[in-house]
Amino acid sequence: MKTLQILMSTYNGAKYIREQMDSLLDQNCEKLGKAAFRIVIRDDGSSDGTQDILEEYAGRYPEKVSWYQGENHGVICSFFELLQRVDASDYYAFCDQDDYWMEDKMTRAVEILDAMRKDVPVLYCCRPKLVDQNLQPLESEIKRPPMRPGFRNAMIENIVTGCTAVFDQSLREMVVKELPQFTVMHDWWLYLIATCFGEIYYDETPYICYRQHQGNVLGTKTRKMDEWKMRFKRFRGNRGNISHQLEEFIRIFGDMGAENENMRLAERFLKVRKSFWARKRFLRDTELYRQRREDDRIFHIILLLGNY
């Protein structure tokens, strides 16, 4: 049977974490002979009783649950530290503290990953189901990406929701080879690696309930004006971040990609920042894309202005 490590980062999550822990322990992948799993948790300095709950679960399920307290470094560093510390395993899954996993989430992920290539890093993710704080479905939803996942998308947009990500030992080794000094989010970093050097599978079927509440920043407004405001706000917030992230990607993995056309594309993307006409030619000659047509149009403007 394969081995699987579920990696959770917690911070003041006492309100919902019991439901999440119970859903993790109810995963049927081990009963069905797909993968034996353990849950490894790093607490990022909680002060609301989260640590007491973690200690309770570790005491009740010592063969399944372990946790430790780290310094308050934020969610990105917390997940990367977990990847550095955990034992070797066939697969790894990222997990948030306030969601709810359907019992066959890991079974589905392992079945897909088992069928993917063995000579490259592989990543599985799925579309989350939006629910309210009581786990009741919301009218709005995260729509499936209309375009195929790929590096030309990953350079400028992330479609991987971290709490749905499951990946193999090869991808883990590439992440911990050298941690980035900057990345927008840990799940975006996985998307870049998988699409540049390996394979990704995006599952359109939701296998987690993605809880929306005051402590969760995902917006779900559906009015057209609100959507456009959110788009421009998101692009302004990422100003310079896309380039900075790709610079780190090239710094760390450049020696692995001498013949990799994706890496060459990323290098060219950074070079054309110096010239409007070079950016215009780049936009005409390459096929970078965002998943939504409206976002694609906005990014074309951002690229021409050099504000990426």
Residue spans for each PLM region:
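Nucleotide-sugar donor-binding/catalytic module of glycosyltransferases
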Residues: 1-222, 307
